[in-house]
């Protein structure tokens, strides 16, 4: 079921019940068997942890913070302490909760540079402005049938994201002939309505 917060963010037609909303977006027939049911996107977006792990046992995002530079991590000095990580969050919850936990992880482990808005009064959180896009992309453009663990790695000098995906094209990207393609359109549709992208 949808939480009250998810319901307020997702459902614009307030007269719809939770079940009507989920069926309107995520109900379909399975190819080959013609069995009807909810699509995996519904479970990944709104499911409870146990339901998600039953349907997609490899679904997780491993968020790791290391207080050293990336080069220092790859080539430590003999005098460096043996620190595997300073903070870690193994996230195995639905995508909406994953988004919130990853954003909290970024805010907890990355410095907040002071910046004022154009009006000169309001303070801007550049971390949120930048990383809501990065986090959304790592969650939206993942290949959810792959068992590869999604990784979100923060180092002192860079952030690295890793997720399994099948590219639509190979070779060089031509900026004059660039077209975006949605990897998971149902998940993207819900995230757009949540104003996370």
Give the role of each language-model region.
Residues 21-24, 105, 190:
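Residues that form generic nucleotide/phosphate-binding pockets
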Residues 26-29, 106-114, 142-143:
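Structural motif corresponding to the C-terminal cap of alpha-helices
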Residues 6, 41-42, 46-98, 126-194:
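Conserved beta-strand-loop-beta-strand hairpin that lines the nucleotide-binding pocket
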């Amino acid at each position: 079921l949808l939480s009250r917060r998810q319901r307020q963010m997702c459902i614009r037609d307030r007269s719809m019940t939770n079940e009507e909303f989920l069926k309107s977006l995520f109900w379909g027939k399975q190819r080959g068997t013609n069995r009807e049911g909810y699509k995996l996107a519904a479970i990944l977006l709104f499911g409870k942890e146990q339901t998600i792990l039953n349907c997609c046992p490899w679904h997780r995002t491993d968020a790791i913070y290391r207080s050293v530079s990336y080069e220092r991590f790859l080539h430590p000095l003999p005098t460096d302490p043996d620190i595997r990580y300073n903070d870690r969050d193994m996230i195995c919850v639905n995508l909406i909760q994953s988004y919130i936990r990853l954003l909290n992880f970024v805010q907890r482990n990355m410095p907040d540079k002071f910046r004022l808005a154009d009006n000169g009064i309001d303070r801007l959180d550049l971390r949120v402005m930048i990383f809501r896009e990065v986090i959304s992309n790592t969650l939206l453009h993942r290949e959810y049938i792959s068992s590869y663990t999604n990784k979100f790695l923060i180092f002192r000098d860079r952030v690295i994201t890793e997720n399994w995906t099948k590219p639509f094209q190979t070779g060089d990207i031509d900026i004059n002939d660039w077209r975006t393609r949605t990897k998971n359109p149902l998940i993207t549709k819900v995230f757009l309505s949540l104003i996370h992208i």
